[in-house]
């Protein structure tokens, strides 16, 4: 299942309670001083802080019912299972098709696969060129250069790799200021392992990919 925000009452999908310290430290006097100092820093670190943090951000992420779940912010308040997220990306990996049914036209797939922007990103991507597609970015990691998708707050992500016909969903419920850098970098070490392992097995075809996507 996949929901844009809190699932409706009666839905079989429920919100997993978040773990970690969330971003509570960002709202303390010490945390505010630290973030304000980092925001003024030159280079990639300062750019990332300015792009992500604003005073009061931590308030919408805390509690048993985080207010962010009342927004329609997919990269921050999406609620889904790994299988649901992988299924969402399956048409992007399989020429617009799922189980023989077309969801995206050939023209739409060509447009989505086309890279629209090659310039380095001066914000969250630490001046690396994320190579933006239509709403998706590449994952510039070993073995994943043909893949694209989107990463969300905390490090959950969805990905499609048209070359192998593989879609991947990775979700978790940890959000902690002390580990957010590592968690957001998860694709950098996880994707090479997944893609290299599946391709090396020699047992994965485009027809099989949707079944093992999650």
Where are these regions (language model features)?
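Catalytic loop of the DD-peptidase/beta-lactamase superfamily, centered on the K-T-G motif
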Residues: 1-214
